[in-house]
């Protein structure tokens, strides 16, 4: 009986230590974040707001770029869902100074301050590269394939714990998959917009694996100050709201002008 109790106690202790070790290991692993940036390169969007966009982008990156955060830049054009439509900026942590000597608390605090300064400079350098990539000139596209990007985005999210999305576009879909400009009104009602989104989402699902956008924390859309088709914005947002909802995104899309 004593032997049974002894082995039972040892087993519980081992399980407890294993659980603690697992918990420490999991806690020590930092979350990986992704910022997805998209810019409309179609002919329907002029470049008059470039300066304001750049100012807004810098503010956005300063607020949300942090350690263990990668950034991907995508163009919105006729090849939006292409695998090559992604310019990556991976976060590389600066090296820490390793010393075997015992350090005072003050020295440890100083070392940490110096390390944080390195992180800040790393992020600043990356932000400049991202802004440059977003403003890079490309050939103007006659198509605006927007909804198609949910497929590559879903694939990207598999390697991350969370993500945010920022889109600079009038978001007027104009491609072979779906064209908002064929009729007098892009979406005559919100219910119509939702129904079309449901059909389009099913069509997108058939093109690849299951679309999962649940890791996205928030989505921001920045439209031109003076869009050419203001009437589209009455019901069109409901279309994209439904697309993202069906993709398991639990938040809302924040629409704004510069």
Please provide the spans of the model-predicted regions.
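Von Willebrand factor
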Residues: 31-160, 163-167
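Bacterial signal peptide processing site
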Residues: 21-23
């Amino acid at each position: 009986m004593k032997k049974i109790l002894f082995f039972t106690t040892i087993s519980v202790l081992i399980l407890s230590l294993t659980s603690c070790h697992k918990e420490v290991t999991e806690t020590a692993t930092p979350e990986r974040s992704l910022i997805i940036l998209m810019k409309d390169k179609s002919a329907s969007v002029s470049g008059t707001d470039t300066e304001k966009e750049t100012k807004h982008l810098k503010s956005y990156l300063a607020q949300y770029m942090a350690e263990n955060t990668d950034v991907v830049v995508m163009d919105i054009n006729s090849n939006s869902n292409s695998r090559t439509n992604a310019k990556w900026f991976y976060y590389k942590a600066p090296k820490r100074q390793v010393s075997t000597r015992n350090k005072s608390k003050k020295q440890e605090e100083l070392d940490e301050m110096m390390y944080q300064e390195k992180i800040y400079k790393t992020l600043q350098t990356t932000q400049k590269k991202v802004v440059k990539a977003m403003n890079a000139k490309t050939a103007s596209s006659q198509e605006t394939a927007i909804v198609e990007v949910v497929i590559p985005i879903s694939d990207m999210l598999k390697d991350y714990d969370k993500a945010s999305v920022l889109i600079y576009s009038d978001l007027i879909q104009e491609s072979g998959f779906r064209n908002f400009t064929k009729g007098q009104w892009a979406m005559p009602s919100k219910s119509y917009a939702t129904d079309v989104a449901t059909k389009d989402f099913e069509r997108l699902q058939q093109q690849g694996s299951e679309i999962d956008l649940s890791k996205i924390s928030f989505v921001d859309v920045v439209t031109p100050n003076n869009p050419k088709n203001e009437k589209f914005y009455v019901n069109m947002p409901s279309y994209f709201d439904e697309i993202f909802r069906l993709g398991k995104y639990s938040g809302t899309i924040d629409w704004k002008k510069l």
